[in-house]
Every structure is written in structure tokens, then in C-alpha cells.
């Protein structure tokens, strides 16, 4: 049965408009994105099929172009649309982050860093550069490593902090394994960067590790 033949109260789009997006399941949200189904499957049926194939909504959203476009009911146009939606979401978070102090908006900081790093298949190290009022100046990815590790050079971090006239920084990197627990090497690198940046009067406010779930704040655990 086509979704158009469903009672209005059960149709995903109508329910979203009436009750808000939060009331919908992953399959229903994906069905709205898909708009139409395929022969023998409504958009909701197709969405459920795709979620089973990928294992989760996150894995579907982070799939590369080749993997995505090979799936039933998907293609280059849908992939382009998805990338546009994801980029708009990242830019929305970036705008929210730039409007006020990062310390006043810790949840936005977490969401932004998660959107920037969680999809990376290899370990990536980045930095949020902040002004004297802890407003975000810019975000930069500084180092990229293998799937297991990355080499972080304090001299390069200092160089970029000076280039942006930063007064403070928030460090971040991802764990492609999904486990957010900091390794001994993570703690060593954090201490080295703290010591190096202190020489130019730049404070390290936090170091976030991005994996599955919410990013881990080393500052909250007393490791900074």
C-alpha cells in the first residue's frame, strides 16, 4: 500500500508537521528524505530495508558515494542531496558556535566536533582556535594519521595559534574504533601541547575525543 493511502495520522510527513521530527522513528525520517519507494515497497518499507542493510542510520549517513549509490532506491541524486543536507547541518552548528563563547555552549561544541570528525575513517587531529573571550575564531584539521595513530607536532599547533592570534584552544581528535577512552599517548600529547602553548600564553581549555556517542571531554575528567 502506498503511503498516500495510509490514514493521515500515520503518514510520516503529516506526523512530523503535527508532532515534530523528534516523534518519528529513524525509518520514518529516512522515508521523508527518500520521498518515494520502489516497486513493491513504500518509502517506509524501503527505509527499513536500507537501515537493515547499513546497520544504523549513522552508517547510512556516513557511507561513501560508491557504497551509498549501489543500494536499492538510492543513486547519485540522493547522495548529492544527502551531502547538501549534512553540510547545511554542519554550517548551522558552526554559526551557532561563532555567535557566543565556546565555554557557554559546551553542547554545541560537542555537536560541532562530532559532525566534523566522527565520519573520518582515519585518525584526525583538529583544533578550535578561540579569542580572549573564548569565542571561536576558526576550526582547522592539523594532522591526519593512520587508522591507529596520528603524529602531532606542537610547533605546528603553535604556528597556527599565532597566525590566528588565538588566546585559547580546544583540541580534538577522533577514534575510528568508536571508543572514546583516551590512550596513554593521548594524555602525553595533551600535556606536551599544554606545555608548548603555555610558552606563548595560549591556554588549552579542553581536549575532546570523538567516537561513538557523545565526545569525551578530558577536562571534565580532570586530565587537563
UniProtKB/Swiss-Prot annotation:
The keyword Oxidoreductase does not apply. InterPro entries: MPN (IPR037518), RadC_JAB (IPR025657), RuvA_2-like (IPR010994), UPF0758 (IPR001405), UPF0758_CS (IPR020891), UPF0758_N (IPR046778). PROSITE patterns: MPN, UPF0758. Zn(2+) binds at residues 173, 175, 186. A motif (JAMM motif) lies at residues 173-186. Residues 102-224 form the MPN domain. It holds the Pfam family UPF0758_N. One of its GO terms (molecular function) is metal ion binding. GO terms for biological process: proteolysis. It comes from the Bacteria. Keywords: Hydrolase, Metal-binding, Metalloprotease, Protease, Zinc. NCBIfam families: PRK00024.1, radc. Belongs to the UPF0758 family. This is UPF0758 protein PFL_6051. It comes from Pseudomonas fluorescens (strain ATCC BAA-477 / NRRL B-23932 / Pf-5).
